[in-house]
Amino acid sequence: MSSKTRMYSSSSPSRRSFLTSVATLGAVSTLAPGFLKAQAANGLVNVAYCGIGNRGEQVIKSMQATGLANVVALCDTDMGAPHTKEVLGLFPGAARFQDFRRMFDKMGRRIDAVVVSTPDFSHFPIAMLAMSQGKHVYCEKPMGQSFRQIELMMQAEHKYKVAAQMGNQGHSDANYHQFKAWVDAGIIRNVTRITAFMNNSRRWHGMKVSGRLPKQAVPPSLDWESWLATAAEHDYNVGYVNGEWRSWFDFGNGALGDWGAHIFDTAHEFLELGLPNEVVPVVIDGHSPYIFPQASTLAFRFPARGSRPPVELTWYDGQRNLPPLPPEFAAPVADPNIPPPSRGSADAKVLPPGKVIYADGLTFQGGTHGSTLKIIPESKALDLAGKLPMVPSSTSNHFENFLLACQGEERCRSSFAVAGPLCQVMALGVIAQRLNTTLAFDSTTRKIANHKVANELLAGAPPRKGWEQYYKL
């Protein structure tokens, strides 16, 4: 398509158009005998990017750096705003859209994969429509806004046989391969306790609100109706957009949803933690029904799994809510590959995000993303130096892994089947923060047994009129 591309905006496609599109393209995946592979004629994966500014810009550059992706479409609800201009300049020939529904209507057959870097609450409808049409999906973390959305996304990955990767990039780096090798070799065994922490400043620190923000005029570049997607109706306010959505229970998932997937993801997968049977808000400082607390300590209690003992994972956020650390804890080193915060502070005086894992006879200190574990104290590390297993190098980074999975050459390391339960753990934590109450979760019935309102929050907010269909794909 030429640089004089048409931009579609505002008016949503008809329900008939939507359902016809899903029925026609979705049938391809149900008829396919196995996994759907991208079939780009030039050997590249034809990619549509949803969310092209802020974090989206970083994801696009990393995806394109693999040399495996061909950009066919760009979609952003605030197309032409300052934060979108660099990407627009990099790909002048790509089709442009403000509404992902129009993008699928007009270009669905040209798209192999969709990359979703929009705010947390709008991941779900884009990913569900893409998967229902047999498109592979790369979705930034966390996968969805609610426990139910995440459940449906896992089901869709399986139903439509697509490659689906969540964007916790460390899941393809050294920490991933080391953690797996050390568990397989019995170096990490019988873990009973994990401390995870993220104590940098966040957007909502210092905020005081008594309700929703007042109505402001919608900027001419922004399609507010499409930005809201399935979320409940809100009047526009600049305090909701460009990262500010992270502060609000209605739109974001707080420090836990933002960072948990980078800190305890490998522990969750390789220790097979699954879902907790109890979540206890030990500390909630500055509780609000609208924005995330100024600090929180949450205890997630996971039951025994076969021969593995129960595990208590304790999460700490808030600038002054520092975790108790073992005396041997070494000076942490922040992973240089972590993207800088778009707002807030990564103050070097504050404890960098990380974790401590207490296992049978050994204690492990770790950071975030791809940073590797170290055994503490150093004397024990020296004793074990010759007994540690070889750790394989990664065959691909997280973006290459996804695109190779689209082509049937690798499996997604953070597939929705793997990342989904991790995100559901965090979704339960967000409910505990929101209500400031202990949750008793029954993994068999997948319900919260002790609190009616909390149980209702598993489903999330009801979708706005006209957006119900994404829950039926």
Q: What feature does the model see in each segment?
A:
Residues S2-C139, E151-A163, Y471:
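N-terminal glycine-/serine-/threonine-rich beta1-alpha1-beta2 phosphate-ribose binding loop
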Residues N46-C50, V71-C75, V115-V116, Y138-C139, ...:
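Structural recognition of the beta-strand scaffold that forms the well-ordered cores
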Residues N54, Q58, E86, D99-R102, ...:
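Extracytoplasmic/secreted proteins, especially bacterial periplasmic and envelope-associated proteins
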Residues Q58-S62, H83-V87, F124-L129, Q149-I150, ...:
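Short, solvent-exposed loop/turn and secondary-structure capping segments
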Residues D78, S117-S122, M143-Q145, I150, ...:
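Short, solvent-exposed turn/loop segments enriched in Gly/Ser/Thr/Pro and often Arg
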Residues H136-Y138, G144-S221, S226:
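A contiguous active-site-proximal alpha/beta segment in oxidoreductase catalytic domains
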Residues Q178, N190, T195-S201, H205-A417, ...:
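Contiguous beta-strand/loop segments that form the cofactor/metal-binding neighborhood of enzyme cores
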